[in-house]
Structure formats: structure tokens, C-alpha cells
Amino acid sequence: MAKKSLIQREKKRQKLEQKYHLIRRSSKKKIRSKVSPLSLSEKTKMQEKLQSLPRNSAPTRLHRRCFLTGRPRANYRDFGLSGHILREMVYACLLPGATRSSW
């Protein structure tokens, strides 16, 4: 089980990312625009605006965690669970449609 503080920190990052998502996306779109190119000074202003946003609002700082244990590694996106929890749940027949492989 992961520490509660780490799980809360991750939730806080998710909220920040959702809050600043539109601002970040529109700023990046304006900087990269080929249709109406910005001057160099306008681009630097937009870049400064991006840099003024909180670091934890960047989507790259988010980390997928296990739904039950909060474990940050070996997560399966389809289930939102870490590998060993997924395995235990499949063995206990708690996940519909998931079966053990045998050959």
C-alpha cells in the first residue's frame, strides 16, 4: 500500500492539470500555429505565460496509480490495477471476462 500522502499528492496534480488544461493547450496551439505565425516577441510572451503556470499542472507530471493500493508501477490501463492485484482478482474470479492463460 502506498503512503496516503503520495496518493493525495497525485490527486492534487490531477486537479491542477484539469484546471489549467485549456490554458496550456491554447497557449501551445498559438505558439505552434502555422496559419497565423506569431512574431518572436509574441512567442516569448506566450512561452512566459506557459512557464508561469504551476509545474504540477503539466500532464507529464501525472503518474498512473493502482485503484486499490496506490502502487505506481506495473499498472494495466484497462483495469486501473497493478499487476499483482489484477492477478489476485482474476484468480478469485472477480473480473468478468478475464481468464488465466494456459497452453
UniProtKB/Swiss-Prot annotation:
It is found in: Plastid, Chloroplast. Belongs to the universal ribosomal protein uS14 family. Its main location: plastid. This is Small ribosomal subunit protein uS14c. The keyword Ribosomal protein applies. Keywords: Chloroplast, Plastid, Ribonucleoprotein, Ribosomal protein, RNA-binding, rRNA-binding. InterPro entries: Ribosomal_uS14 (IPR001209), Ribosomal_uS14_bac/plastid (IPR023036), Ribosomal_uS14_CS (IPR018271). Part of the 30S ribosomal subunit. Binds 16S rRNA, required for the assembly of 30S particles. It comes from the Eukaryota. One of its GO terms (biological process) is translation. The gene is rps14. HAMAP family: Ribosomal_uS14_1. Residues 27-56 are annotated as: Disordered. One of its GO terms (cellular component) is chloroplast. One of its GO terms (molecular function) is structural constituent of ribosome. It comes from Zea mays (Maize). PANTHER family: 30S RIBOSOMAL PROTEIN S14 (PTHR19836), SMALL RIBOSOMAL SUBUNIT PROTEIN US14M (PTHR19836:SF19). The keyword Electron transport does not apply.
